[in-house]
């Protein structure tokens, strides 16, 4: 897993924007001597108003796939993203039109995400049908066994992950033998027929380890789990078609070691996982509501 604080950091790429009445020209330069593939280009929409309902992105006059995302759930789109493949030492200009009417355009999905409550009336492990987008639980409530595949799962054609909905919040791995989206069909638990057909499977035993990586506390000698929180929320912010965004919020987190020098008061931590199409790495952003200079993680 890869932890980043910046929304996007593309080494060797630079962008400039010219705007006229919500018509944008986005120029992207690859200054490196190697090609760059599946590079996410993310545009902050705050300067362009709160009435954006649709976006059209074109390269050389041809429309390409793009995605609008409402990150904070206020009904306004915060970011526009699209994916760029760039030859070495090249410059490409993308034309973006922002519209205040209509609906977001639809494109072939290159990513997938789901959260599913366990339906005990459905016996099959990959035919569960109680889909949700968000769940918040109180202190002391552990929904791990009530969640099918134990929390939100998300994938692109190369990789697939899930996040445990409990005090570990570990990122677990689903291995693939071939490129393609599989979780909608396997729901993380491949049956015999699917295995014979070449589908992937849950390949990592996590336990109390860090799995592929997770954010935890540190008491000076060892990591601490996120056991004492006022509320824990896991939600899917975006389902695609170009990126999935999954968020974990630990509201009022109190370390089990009590009021020591590292954790003198409760804090709220938000961990956001963004997976783009065509990439094996997952962008992880961690935000804190309070100052945490005296905390260790």
Predicted stretch roles:
Residues 95, 100-226:
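Solvent-exposed N-terminal domain segments of exported/luminal and surface proteins
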Residues 27, 44, 97, 247-249, ...:
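Residue-level recognition of well-ordered beta-strand positions that form the cores
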Residues 132-139, 249-251, 283-285:
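Gly/Pro-rich turn-and-neighbor structural signature
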Residues 1-25:
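Bacterial Sec-dependent N-terminal signal peptides
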């Amino acid at each position: 897993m890869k932890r980043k604080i910046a929304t996007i950091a593309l080494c060797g790429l630079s962008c400039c924007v010219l705007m006229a009445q919500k018509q944008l020209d986005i120029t992207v330069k690859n200054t490196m001597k190697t090609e760059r593939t599946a590079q996410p280009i993310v545009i902050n929409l705050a300067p362009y108003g709160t009435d954006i309902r649709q976006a059209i992105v074109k390269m050389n006059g041809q429309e390409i796939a793009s995605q609008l995302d409402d990150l904070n759930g206020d009904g306004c789109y915060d970011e526009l993203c699209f994916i760029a493949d760039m030859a070495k030492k090249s410059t490409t200009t993308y034309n973006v039109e922002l519209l205040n009417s209509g609906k977001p355009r639809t494109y072939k999905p290159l990513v997938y995400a789901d959260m599913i409550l366990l339906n005990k009336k459905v016996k099959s492990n990959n035919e569960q049908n109680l889909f949700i987008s968000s769940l918040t639980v109180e202190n002391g409530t552990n929904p791990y066994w009530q969640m099918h595949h134990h929390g939100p799962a998300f994938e692109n054609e190369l990789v697939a992950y899930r996040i445990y909905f409990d005090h570990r919040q570990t990122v677990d791995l689903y291995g693939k033998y071939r490129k393609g989206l599989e979780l909608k069909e396997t729901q993380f638990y491949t049956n015999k027929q699917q295995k014979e057909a070449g589908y992937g499977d849950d390949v990592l035993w996590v336990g109390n380890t860090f799995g592929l990586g997770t954010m935890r506390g540190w008491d000076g000698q060892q990591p601490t789990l996120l056991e004492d929180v006022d509320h824990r929320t896991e939600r899917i912010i975006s389902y695609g078609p170009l990126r999935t965004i999954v968020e974990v919020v630990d509201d009022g987190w109190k370390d089990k070691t009590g009021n020591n020098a590292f954790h003198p008061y409760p804090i709220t931590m938000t961990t956001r996982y963004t997976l783009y199409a065509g990439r094996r790495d997952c962008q992880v952003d961690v935000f804190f509501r309070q100052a945490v200079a005296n905390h260790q993680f």
